[in-house]
A protein has these predicted regions:
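Nucleotide-sugar donor-binding catalytic core of glycosyltransferases
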Residues: 1, 102-267
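Extended catalytic core of nucleotide-activated donor transferases of GT-like folds
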Residues: 1-99, 117-120, 134-139, 264-267
Length: 267
């Protein structure tokens, strides 16, 4: 599109910061980042008592948040004045708008790899004098030879990792947390926040959105537990049925299954 792009090297913050200041043009430059990189008070862009370089030069900050907002509760404190949040999931978008109304939300951006045919209307004609963009349909894509039949991408954490967090307060809270976990696993079509909020309301009555967003942040171990429970079960049922699965990610060597020879580990 013709824009100059500056890549900030987080492994060389101080040198990058010097170059960044020379690159910034107030009123023109914007920050585009993922998962709050450059917005966590890094040494090169933040100085105690002064603040962010983004505020110093009035740079708009567009943050593309990949994970669920309840993972970011603490990061959503003390951000630059011109902070704009972008979600990659429709449910994340709805959650953020409801529980963090004090922030400017800039909508939804699909991840790379999403089928644009499902997100955009095909239009090969002219509209208001401009040629619209045509996205290739599935049927006209050239077939490619597959190297792997079944792939699992993502890290694996045994559910035992979450046990200390389930029991971190007392037995009453542990039963509360375990009840949420069991409910989500029994009803996989429901989201973590949907079930957790239902249990919170049942146990504690109505609460403010600020209280609830803090409570959900403190229950992110439930998300980790359920996510890895289903990852474990999905891979186990396949490899134990004799299907070879190529897994890409950390922690899969800790998976216990009947036929580990069918699970091919990749770094």
């Amino acid at each position: 599109m013709g824009y100059n792009v500056f890549y900030f090297d987080l492994e060389d913050e101080m040198n990058s910061a010097k170059k960044l200041r020379r690159f910034i043009k107030p009123g023109e430059t914007v920050l585009v980042t993922f998962n709050f990189e450059g917005l966590e008070k890094e040494a090169g862009v933040y100085r105690e008592g002064i603040g962010y370089v983004w505020d110093e030069y009035a740079v708009p900050c567009y943050n593309i948040a990949v994970d669920h907002p309840y993972y970011y509760h603490e990061r959503l404190a003390d951000l630059p004045e011109k902070y704009y949040h972008i979600s990659i999931d429709r449910l994340h978008e709805a959650y953020f708008k409801h529980f963090y109304p004090e922030f400017m939300h800039r909508g939804f951006l699909p991840l790379a790899g999403s089928r644009l045919e499902e997100l955009c209307k095909l239009n090969t004609g002219k509209e208001e004098g401009k040629q619209s963009v045509e996205y290739p349909a599935e049927r006209i894509r050239k077939p490619v030879e597959k190297k792997y039949n079944v792939i699992m991408t993502g890290n694996f954490t045994p559910t035992s990792f979450c046990e200390p967090y389930i029991h971190w307060i007392n037995d009453e809270y542990a039963a509360f947390y375990q009840g949420i976990i069991d409910d989500i696993i029994a009803h996989p079509h429901r989201t973590v926040e949907e079930v957790a909020l239902e249990h919170c309301e049942r146990e504690m009555g109505e609460n403010t959105y600020k209280d609830l967003r803090m409570a959900l942040h403190r229950m992110i171990f439930i998300d980790i537990y359920v996510r890895n429970y289903w990852r474990r079960e999905a891979v186990k049922v396949l490899v134990d049925a004799g299907i070879q699965v190529d897994v890409f990610g950390k922690g899969w060597d800790e998976l216990t299954c009947g036929h580990p020879e069918n699970m091919i580990l990749h770094p």
